[in-house]
Amino acid sequence: MKNCLTIIALVYSISFLAQTQNVRGKVMDSETNYPLAGAKVEIDLKNENGVNYRAVTDAEGAFTINTVPVGKYSLTTRFMQYEPKTQTIELNSGKELILAILLQESVTNKDEVVVNGRKKGEIINELAVISAQQFSVEETNRYPGSRMDPARMASNFAGVQGADDSRNDIIIRGNSPLGVVWRVEGIDIPNPNHFAIAGSSGGPVSVLNNKILGNSDFIMSAFPAEYGNSVSGVFDLKLRSGNDQRHEFTGQFGLLGTEFLAEGPLNKKGNASFLMMGRYSTLSLFQTFGIKLGTDAIPTYGDLAFKFNFKLRKGGNLSLWGMGGKSRISIMISEKTEYTTDLYGEGDRDQYFGTSMAVSGLNYKKAINEKTFVSSTLAYSQEVQQANHDYLQRSLTINGGDTTIQIDSIYPLMAYTFKTQKISSYTALNHKINKQHLVKFGYNADLFLMNMHDSALVDYYTPNVFFTRWNYEGSCVLIQPFIQWKWRMTDNTDFTAGIHSQYFSMSNSLSPAELRLGFKHKLSGNQSVFAGAGMHSQAQPLYTYVDNRKGAGNFFNKGMDFTKSLHSGVGYEKFFTKGFSVRTEAYYQYLYNIPVTIAPSSFSMINMGSGFTRIFADSLENTGTGYNYGLELTVQKYFDKSFFFLFSGTLYDSKYTGSDGVLRNTSYNGSYVANLLAGKEFKLGKRNILGIGTKVTTAGGKRYGLVDLVKTNAEKDLIYRDSMFNELQFKDYFRMDLKISWRMNAKAMTHEIGLDLVNILNTKNLLSLAYAPSLDPAVVNSPNYQPVSEKTQLGFLPIFYYKIDFRAGGKPR
């Protein structure tokens, strides 16, 4: 017994002694990606010899620091005639930390450049000097209520808010979610969400997984010339490469799915790696345990992602990457014996809905020399939406004290399939003329192949008599060349200018020259001021161009032009010690050329893009206008000393004018939004870490109008009075979230258990009005009868997960 206890104690003590990890990476010039040989990398932790853990980069800019105790530290990188960079790193025993460190060359000729108060979370694209935020996977993973979803994480930033708790559409400065572009490796990708409605940018569950992402950029306005076809914002996402020296694995099980990730070297030379992951939904399992998901129907979905990375001779890099997802849901109202309204469905029909998206690309990058860098991507993508509805004719059956619903008949109501394929090409070349001047130029080109079919009943009460709403097979191209110039006037002053051009063949629309300007100046005392302005254009959702409801071949909106925008902003920020910063920004955006109906009405494309409905517009013309202006404040302490907090607040106004000439609130004008997040980690012993975080969000209520009851009853759909559109507002939105996690570092592995309690107070926030007819004749015939109900957003939602990171073999070279 004594020997047994001794062995157990020995094994236990070894697990404590083994809590170390390696830090590896590459140091490069931030503008040309050229490797910096001889750069010094140092961690603020002393080893057994009394000196800090440190390394010097080799001829390829690579470094390795071995056997660093797990924990959080500051890592500083220095190189002659470059500005030093300090960042916080966190090591756990299950995954090696691999960094890509970008240093900016100094304009001065001093060997040692001193820069105080370097900001953690600096934007990766240095051409973006205003309204840009680094999307840090490490930082945003701590945000409660974000469900590990990039879009929901971004909704915590100033100027950004979610449109609906059940979806991740984001509203940027009062703009429609239609204006958001998702970009990966230079390519604009299809909507990366499950259950995505055609033309939208959001959905209930993201296909993207933060475990495959590196730090990325989120840009909200006056973005550099390389970005186009957007009047709102851009997610410029970076896919990380797999570990090229040893195999590592991640498994996770929870409410949102069961997933597995594997990464590692493809050969013993360490010049090729892979990263692969897959996820499948587990909602049905949790529904069985009585956890309410906001709908009686059980959605199913699965997704995968991969990246194969190959280091080529003479500094080139080739990567093959891809991601995709498939989802489906069946809302069977006919199976219910008691009438209920459903968040995702309508009470008078069975609905079957499925979507899929996939994108795969081949990217080549090479630092040609110390001054020139080229990146080129060729990609194929596809997205499909399929749906069919069966109409239910029902009646009430009363038997004694029991009332049940009787299905009298079921017949097809509508069906559609929208399929869009895209072949994309992107090339950009960065050339550093000298220390002060950088030029970047290139193009994006997309070839769209569309196959869109839709038919519906002419009349609800006449089965099998259909009319065609969409019947189109064809193609079009979108071409976007650009050129951008950056002038580093001094080490403290940057000026950028660029021109973006855009041509869309479907409507023969051309925006020949969109000017983009940016300016940033660093003041004394770790302060800076910045300003920017830009012209932007955006095409409409593809299917809206080929609406066929007015007869075969009569695509009455095929000539729609771009929506256009002039966006400007100014700002100020101050950096303090220990990762604390304050930032404020004021902006004004004027939108014009917005599609509105030819006949006078309140309709405007500016209000479209969120929710689960497509756009059914009449004949449109580009005469609508709108504006957004606001003031944003961000007070932030980045995660340091085991604590973080973030306050973001926005006061704004968002208005538009339709073809009737009336100035109205847009559907996204909540007037204000504020977020307060805070989190603290507690170290329990040598291996365990307890994390607690909370988030409080409040915002102006959603806009709505008076219902036209006559038209609503006739159309069997919710119809508002046109003259009163968006004149009313629901009560203010309020939600509180709480996140609790426990992490344990064991030998060669890390365990984590988390509970994200979304809307912990179960606040009943109003989402919208809905068409909800009664089946009771006594109710229908009453004088005050209205077939309208209020829909609330998601209530309390506990999201549980268990995650394990572990490694197998391999030693750093």
Where are these regions (language model features)?
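Transmembrane beta-barrel wall of Gram-negative outer-membrane proteins
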Residues: G254-Y280, L293-M332, Y352-Y380, I433-F441
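C-terminal beta-signal and adjacent terminal beta-strands/loops
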Residues: F645, V696-K716, Y733-R735, W742-R813
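Periplasm-facing N-terminal accessory domains of Gram-negative outer-membrane beta-barrel systems
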Residues: A18-E112, R118
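Outer membrane beta-barrel strand-and-loop segments of large Gram-negative receptors
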Residues: M414, K422-S424, R469-S475, Q480, ...
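Gram-negative outer-membrane beta-barrel transporters
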Residues: T490, Y588-Y590, F612-G700, K803
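Flexible loop and strand-edge segments within Gram-negative outer membrane beta-barrel domains
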Residues: N317-A367, Q382-Q406, I410-K419
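Surface-exposed extracellular loop regions of Gram-negative outer-membrane beta-barrel proteins
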Residues: N193, G199, S334-E335, Y339, ...
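Periplasmic N-terminal accessory/gating domains of Gram-negative outer-membrane beta-barrel systems
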Residues: E83, E90-I98, V114-F223, V234, ...
